[in-house]
A protein has these predicted regions:
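Phosphate/NTP-binding elements of NTP-utilizing enzymes
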Residues: 1-222
Length: 222
């Protein structure tokens, strides 16, 4: 597996702060992956070997880190922060995915928080998929809907000051208030639904209103 981060520095930080603690705290992984500091482990911060496979963490700005060994699974993370080219070698996502050309069962995953509409990499990738969204049923009218930030409403005091602690979700169909506890139940009981024809690629969109943690003290609009 190749996990591609925006830069090589970010790849090292992600490996130390996210990957290493996960391996350390998950018993089945601890037994499989030797610590990079262990003598003769063969592992480094950016490359972990284990029985049956390996994980390489690379930077999209480093053509060298995108070269060498073949990879079956390519996970490109935070692609909207990638440079347009890995040095002079071209698009880093294409370079990474070419490493899986020899596998009939290759898997490509592209993820990111979207940035600017119209120039976002992940938006362009999502538009090529069946565009699955998380649909939830209103606790009042039972109509399924996707949760949007436009559905968040709040009160103002007599001076026009916003009162964030009064923020609540409004059903897009019946316009009734939905409490945060009701929202959590909605999200837990929701389902993925494709909103475009399937042409070989699955895509998933999920925003912060579907998050189940941390507990909210009002909503922050974005």
């Amino acid at each position: 597996m190749l996990i591609l981060q925006p830069t090589l520095d970010m790849a090292e930080t992600w490996s130390k702060d996210r990957l290493a603690p996960m391996v350390r705290d998950t018993a089945v992984l601890t037994d499989l992956v030797a610590d990079a500091k262990a003598r003769d482990s063969g592992n480094t911060v950016l490359h972990k070997r284990f029985t049956g496979g390996h994980v390489t963490v690379a930077g999209a700005n480093s053509p060298t880190s995108l070269a060498s060994r073949p990879i079956r699974v390519v996970l490109a993370d935070e692609v909207d922060r990638y440079p347009q080219s890995a040095g002079a070698e071209g698009d880093p996502i294409s370079l990474a995915q070419k490493r899986s050309d020899t596998f009939f069962n290759s898997v490509h995953v592209t993820t990111s928080t979207p940035t600017i509409k119209g120039v976002s990499r992940v938006e362009a990738e999502f538009d090529l998929t069946d565009q699955r969204r998380w649909f939830c049923a209103c606790p009042h009218c039972k109509e399924y809907q996707t949760l949007k930030w436009e559905q968040v409403s709040w009160d103002k005091d007599e001076d026009g000051k916003h009162l964030p602690e009064t923020a609540r979700l409004i059903c897009s169909e019946c316009n009734k208030d939905i409490s945060d506890k009701q929202r959590e139940v909605m999200v837990r009981q929701g389902e993925w639904r494709a909103t475009a024809p399937f042409e070989g690629k699955r895509g998933y969109h999920l925003n912060g209103l579907c998050s189940l943690f941390p507990p909210r003290k009002g909503y922050k609009t974005r």
